[in-house]
Amino acid sequence: MKHSLFIVFFLCLGSFASAQQLTSPDGNLSLEFMEQADGVPAYRLDYKGKPVLTSGRLGLLTEEADLTRGFKQTNLERASVDNYWNPVWGEYNRVRNHYNEMTVTLEQPETGRILNIRFRLFNDGLGFRYELPLQRKMNYLTV
């Protein structure tokens, strides 16, 4: 029985190993990035511990490549920004730019294609974008 519990513990540990966490500067928003079955990138967003998005799948489907599955995480970078910028027009003459950032680098081992997903969590929202670094196996894409 102890041996079975030990095996179950390590199987569960492995399923959480690929999950990455990011929180907003005030700690109210929490994002979890994970790889689902078949290397499908996904994320979850909580506000004050309650789910806002339970499972959002990520990726790009193009005419040239399927960038929605078959990924392995190869790198992770984090950053925090807290500065101000001055808009040219609008209600405010100074705007605070305050967020925590996480960039996840994914690679498809079968194709060698690389996709970066950059998440930014502000106190009042989430933004993310796909970045396709220059690479031999992908000269152009039609989305």
Walk through the language-model features, giving the residues of each.
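N-terminal accessory beta-strand-rich subdomains and adjacent acidic, glycine-rich linkers
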Residues: 21-143
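Sec-dependent N-terminal signal peptides
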Residues: 4-14
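Sec/Tat signal peptide C-region and signal peptidase I cleavage site
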Residues: 15-19
